[in-house]
Amino acid sequence: LGRYNDFPRVMLGTDGMHSDMIRSAQSSYFIAGLAEGGMSPLAAYQRLRAVHAHIQGHNAPGGGANNLVILNYDSPTPLTQDNFPGHFCYAFDARNVESVISQGRLIVDHGRPAGMDEAGILAYANEQARRLWALL
């Protein structure tokens, strides 16, 4: 595998496999642990956060102070600023995302998409998936 820090500018993504960025960061952390030098929980968290520097460096919208993720997490052990990355790598998952504000707009409210027809979107996605699979 080499060393994970050979590519410090590599960010995380889901590549269409799933939409869970927390899971992607955790996978990165565990896979990097197999490589020479490993990766700390803080380094895995910083990789996830690197997208903000990329967005700001390219003057793209998003990544500003008007974005917020609110987690609902009942920690079985004390949660501090120092051990937050460890909780992030070992305990958090998408179920903990309670609300998300993106560019000042509430887009997830109490774990559900806000301001959109979730059932309609899922039905449309299902229809398009059937069309795609028919072509494959």
Place the predicted regions along the sequence by residue.
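Active-site microenvironment of metallo-dependent hydrolases
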Residues: 44-136
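His/Asp/Glu-enriched, well-ordered alpha-helical/loop segment
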Residues: 1-73, 92
